[in-house]
Curated annotation (Swiss-Prot):
GO cellular component: cytoplasm
CDD domains given in the database record: IGPD (cd07914)
Protein name: Imidazoleglycerol-phosphate dehydratase
Upper classification of the organism: Bacteria, Bacillati, Actinomycetota, Actinomycetes, Acidothermales
Annotated GO biological process: L-histidine biosynthetic process
Region feature (Disordered): 1-24
């Protein structure tokens, strides 16, 4: 299919990256194609986290494959954190010099009673602002406090500025899922090639 038929400019080179991260606690493999079709294959050993990362890939239009083996006998913290770090690194590497991208993206996404607003700047500088309602501590084996840490870890390696505000929500599943969907839509907007030559910064680099 001609990429221009969907309103997307064809990338000059494939925007993709593969990252392997090995520690004494985890083994992580991430393959990311920015200009994909939303095809996802996620296996971290944490079912709810798999579901969240699938939302991220699908709604961003990324092809995303993640395989993580971690010390789940301890808890899910290392698995979740290291996966997010590797994903952020893959995102940064896939974008390269960021020439021709829109750079900024935003989204307002509902999920039943939950509502999330996200704004992103692919600035090259990691910064996170995050707010969400209080909720139950566990969804299955997933600690809901980990979601903020996902974004902290992703932002640290992706080198982006990310604002996330959950404006409404009662159901913990919805409060978490709507964040991943909204971030996905904002990233999809920010990585789009807009036909303007060069890097979108007066500094000449991002």
């Amino acid at each position: 299919m001609d990429p221009t038929a969907s309103g997307r400019q064809a990338p000059r080179n494939p925007r993709q990256a593969t990252v392997q991260r090995e520690t004494k606690e985890t083994s992580v493999s991430v393959a990311l194609v920015v200009d994909g079709t939303g095809t996802v294959d996620i296996d971290t050993g944490v079912p709810f986290y798999d579901h969240m990362l699938a939302q991220l890939g699908k709604h961003a239009g990324f092809d995303l494959t993640v395989v993580t083996r971690g010390d789940l006998d301890v808890d899910a913290h290392h698995t979740v954190e290291d996966t997010a770090l590797a994903l952020g690194q893959a995102f940064r590497e896939a974008l390269g010099d960021k020439a021709g991208i829109r750079r900024f993206g935003d989204a307002l996404v509902p999920l039943d009673e939950a509502l999330c607003q996200v704004a992103v700047d692919l600035s090259g500088r990691p910064y996170l602002v995050h707010s969400e309602p209080e909720m139950v501590e566990l969804i299955g084996t997933y600690e809901t406090t980990l979601t903020r840490h996902v974004w902290e870890s992703f932002v640290a390696q992706a080198h982006i500025c990310l604002h996330i505000q959950v404006l409404a929500g009662r159901n913990a599943h919805h409060i978490n899922e709507v964040q991943f969907k909204a971030v996905a839509r904002a990233l999809r907007d920010a990585v789009r090639l807009d036909g303007v030559a060069g890097v979108p910064s007066t500094k000449g680099a991002l």
